[in-house]
Amino acid sequence: MLSSFCGDGHPFSTGLPNVSICAQHTVLVWVPAAFFLLTLPFLSAQCHLTAQRFARLPFSAHFIIKLLLVAFLAANSLATWCYVLFSKNSYAAAYYVYPGLWVLVWTGTFLVHLIRLRCGLVSSGIQHVTSLIFLLCGAPEFYQWIRMENSNSFPNDLTTTDSAQFLSIAYLSWYSALILYTFSLCFADPRGAKTDDEKASSKSAASPELQSSFLNRLTLWWFNSIPWTGARRDLEIDDIFELNERSGTEFLSELWESFWEPKRLKYIHDTSIWAKKDPSEQEKDPVVIPSVVSSLFMMFRWEFLLASTLKFVSDTMQFASPFLLHELLNFISAKNAPFWKGMALSILMFSVSELRSLILNGYFYIMFRMGTKIQTSLTAAVYKKTLLISNSARRDRTVGEIVNLMAIDVERFQMITPQIQQFWSCPYQITFALVYLFITLGYSALPGVVIMVIFVPMNIISSMIVRKWQIEQMKLKDERTKMVNEVLNGIKVVKLYAWEVPMEAYIDEIRTKELALIKKSAMVRNILDSFNTASPFLVALFSFGTFVLSNPSHLLTPQIAFVSLALFNQLRSPMTMIALLINQAVQAVVSNKRLKEFLVAEELDEKCVDRSVNIERSHNAVRVENLTASWDPEEAAGEKTLQDVDLTAPRNSLIAVVGKVGSGKSSLLQALLGEMGKLRGRIGVNGRVAYVPQQPWIQNMTLRDNITFGRPFDRKRYDQVLYACALKADIKILPAGDQTEIGEKGINLSGGQKARVSLARAVYQNLDVYLLDDPLSAVDAHVGRHIFEKVIGPNGLLREKTRILVTHGLTYTKMADEILVMLEGKIEESGTFEHLIKRRGLFFDFMEEYKSGSDNSSEAGGSQDDDFEAIGGEIQDYMNPEDVVLTVTNDLDETIRTPELTTQISTMSSPEKPPTGTSPAAATESQNKLIKKEGIAQGKVEIATYQLYVKAAGYLLSIAFIGFFIVYMTLQILRSFWLSAWSDEYDPDSPSAHPMAKGWRLGVYGALGFSETACFFVALLALVFVGQRASKNLHGPLIHNLMRSPMSFYDTTPLGRILNRCAKDIETIDMMLPMNFRYLVMCVLQVAFTLIVIIISTPLFAVVILPLALIYLIFLRYYVPTSRQLKRLESVHRSPIYSHFGETIQGAASIRAFGKVDEFRQDSGRILDTFIRCRYSSLVSNRWLAVRLEFVGNCIIFFAALFAVLSKEFGWITSPGVIGVSVSYALNITEVLNFAVRQVSEIEANIVSVERVNEYTNTPNEAPWRIEGREPAPGWPSRGVVKFDGYSTRYREGLDLVLHDISADVAAGEKIGIVGRTGAGKSSFALALFRMIEAAGGRIVIDDVEVSQIGLHDLRSNITIIPQDPVLFSGTLRFNLDPFFTYSDDQIWRALELAHLKHFAAGLPDGLLYKISEAGENLSVGQRQLVALARALLRHTRVLVLDEATAAVDVATDALIQETIREEFKECTVFTIAHRLNTIMDYDRIMVLDKGSILEFDTPDALMADKNSAFAKMVADAAEQDKHE
């Protein structure tokens, strides 16, 4: 039938390398036509999706040319069809059908182009592939017509020469036009030109990806400009292409919410119904939390399906290589095989490999792009949820857990995405390979398959064991990082107490355990890797052994040996991958669980606070009725933070809220913000709300931006706010004025300055209702009075606003319109100041305590109630450890202006401080930042960095590692050539045919394989010791040097940057670098030995090595610097994501209160998009390289096969076995070439961690801890006589003096009060005593010992300080009191008793072994301060410094501390730095400092007697503040 249709008796026969005319006119026409028709729906969908995003394309010359070519192809097909239809000659049926199909296809193509123009689709892969298929299928007929024209012989079914000539000219012109058309599709149709506004909207270039043609995208040609730029200079962020709209945070966030939000709302609805059911029914019908994975699949289902299709095609095509290898070996073995067949096989091997490479790279490109989109979607979702989550849900999660959701769990989703298709791909590859093996070896393949199957559970079990150890190791790493974090947080206290040694020992102890687990995991992995690497050999050994021994007729020919070996090698990858997939899947399931639980967690109830404008609109701004609220409504039955609260705040009124610590004052403000769970009652707030938290929230931006907070800049309003908040003097000393970037959490501002910036932000917003949580507690008397008068009070800027002020400063309450007195979550009393005084109730008692409690100065200490503090404090301390860097320096002297601040600014910017009053515009950009941004490393990594790592690892171990790998590769090649000789011994024509006993062949093959495996294992064993030694020798000195670094280092270096060295960089050194070096050495050796094998097999191959190597090096020249810089950009732009996230968590309440949630989400989106731009470009650069290097690898395959064919054709003696070895090695080189370059790039990126760690290992150190021969006598100081003799000091060489010519003699046991206005030098005085800053002149002598002549530890361990902000560490209560374990339990209990903590400690479950949480968050502020007092009592040195140690506690606790100090330290010399003047009025002498000099130094009585003395004026200021009547 087909013969009749074609008019040919032999429809598919061919004697030459031709395709029959029948096939040309049937199959080769039907296939492309069918492809075109079947893909039309997909093309239609592509046009529809594109039309939603882009405008219509303009008519361009390029488009018109394509349209004309398609029109010609259609017209030519129509002419051919008409000629055949209306010709007088008779033709076979096929001649009538195929032109008609052409007309249909090309007419359809013409219409598709017009539709594509309208839809804005610049290029279509479907059209390009269709034209390529037409081109390939038409090639045989094109060749046929040319051959017939040359020979002037035509087929029998063409009856006349004229008809033959017409059809010949028609087809040749048609095919020529098809070539031109296919070439034109290599270029995309241009879009319309951008407008000037669009060009100016971004500094970075728009990505050309979406404007590129299909071939351009397939080869990633559009990315060329990035490597081109990267090879010429270091890349900058502006060089990186912008993300496409659908890869950006804004689009993906909306897409995520469209799929996730309905599921979340349904879950909440179902949960509310479920909660009402009986417990028995609840167990039977639990509510299932919606899966994150299902939502992600729905978002990216079409991309996923496209990638699946590509993966399926790629996996199928990989089995073409063994088939073609089999045919090539058959060709080599056959004596009379035609030369063209060998050439065709060579071309086919190259074409199939190159096509598979392009398809596989397309698959990875899609999946990696999907991974970045998933990362963007989930990161944005976690960020948004953080701003909406309720406090009760938030309390169940530490900050670390929330950060890990973004840093680890989201990252896992991104990393597993490219591998997710392997779950179906691996079984498919295994099945296909097994079928092929059974065809090749029969049942002899079974032993090999059984071995590979055994490896699967072995891999799984080993992975589970390693995973268990990895979890333990991660816990130890977290514990070590947390401890380093805490030590660096409290580094000033650590140094003041001389605790560096026990802290370093504690960290080293954790590190030793961590390294032990890393070693155990590595050993198991190495055993597993050795088995996996040996698996092809073991499988081949048993399979070949079974094959040749089971039947004497079974001959191990090259075709069987090397095709089977190729299949075994292809089996190894999916078999090994299964265990990794299971491991990754388990991690992904855990991450999915953690993410979905967080994303469905309870959110703040927006309806909790009624913000309707109609609430008491005529008069009241705030109305609270019968409010009962709790931080955890689900556990409200046990504890209610607020109970039965009624509150009315008229418009423009000032309401003062007072009460003891923990009475619920801060909780009341939180309830008004909607932050607490409302159990019953009603809250109404009329107007926009501003919130000033007790712990100031400062962003990492300029001072001005912190104050304007997104509002337009209004100079007049701004200046008013600066003056009212007493910030003008501060701005004058900043290097760039208010344009100075003040660092994370305002690291270089004092507590008082941060409080005033926080207040200024709220005032500048000009809102309606102000909730002020004790904003005056951090400032001293005259500043507090100024702020109250100019901002809060009846005549302040907020006089026309409603103000609810929480305060411990009872002197401010007189001017309040109403006072609320809180006790245990209830409003006990309310009324005006006069009314409450007359009632002589709770408020009157407070006033009495206030008057008699030694604090009538500028502020009364206060803190949040414990419930709120548990949340706020955790965020503050965990996320931004830098906050405590200047605790002593700043909090000793916190207000308008401090020389210490000026000095630190100078330290961080330039040696020359700008003159006071310098215009911000005149300041250089470098002066704007107090903390400099971390620089991006540029250029190549120095060879010295590699030498440093090798030196740390040990030279002998490094040489052993490389040496055993060389032996391993040598044995592998010997084994391959032994197999070659074995397979050739049955070929009588082979020059290497030397028959041997099968047992001997098998034995030697096995011996070589086992020796090879042993060498591989020993090499890996050496690598384990290399990594362990390097890790130990790099981490230990780093920690030691950090302990030895002076405070100036910590003043100018954000702790986050230091922590990055101790955490991320050390992890890279531990885990990544050993693996990088392993794979690099393996790849380099494998490439080198492969080339050697091919040259030995076919010496002619040496001719092409040089050009191929040149091409390879050119690609390296462009890729390596580009990849290196992209990795660095990615690393640098990753940090802002977490910094901004940390700021957001810390300031979530403020962000919600000010209504800035959407703005912060947009800011987070911009930061995230910048990072994703870098990561996406880095991933694309890998694919860009892979496309090009795999082309080089495929060229090696082609030349290896080609020279084998030429060797046979020209009589160069080459056996099939040797050719089998050569081509087998060549088939494996493609991925190795790419992987080798990737490893070079990875090592360059990761070795930077060694450089960064070494940088902080060699920073300048402070003075020695101990000086041999200069140790003070035991018991020193025994008297406590302190002498300052002309003492001067500065913070660093070259900076201004902060203390000038201080001379003072302090007798033993004397009590000295140190006071002064802000900037007087009080904090510098305390730091100088402990040598935290060194003398620039003069000396300090304690008991006849000059302190500069002894070691720092000898000094600091023998004098004591009680800081204002007590620092506690994770560990037991005992460890926090006595880390050296110097004192007995009885002594510690005695100290706790004297510190009024014994009753508390005795009631703890574990007593002295009670676990203190991070930063001591499970103790109240007052309890932490008492622990600091207990430390001082334990040490009981003769010299004691009190750094305003009672500022953060209430009056009662203050009285306890003062009483204990007076009693227990009555024989000691005491220096008290005080803002509260009443605490020092009974001291022996008062030292008044001013501008770094002693202004006055006399007894309190003498100074008070002189009414013109500075001290007398300070007391008068405080007294003025205390007037109540």
From Swiss-Prot:
Keywords: ATP-binding, Cell membrane, Glycoprotein, Membrane, Nucleotide-binding, Repeat, Transmembrane, Transmembrane helix, Transport. Residues 305-587, 959-1245 form the ABC transmembrane type-1 domain. It is a multi-pass membrane protein. The lineage of its organism: Eukaryota, Metazoa, Ecdysozoa, Nematoda, Chromadorea. GO terms for cellular component: membrane; plasma membrane. Pfam families: ABC_membrane, ABC_tran. This is Multidrug resistance protein mrp-7. It comes from Caenorhabditis elegans. Expressed in head neurons, including the dopamine (DA) motor neuron, and other cells in the body.
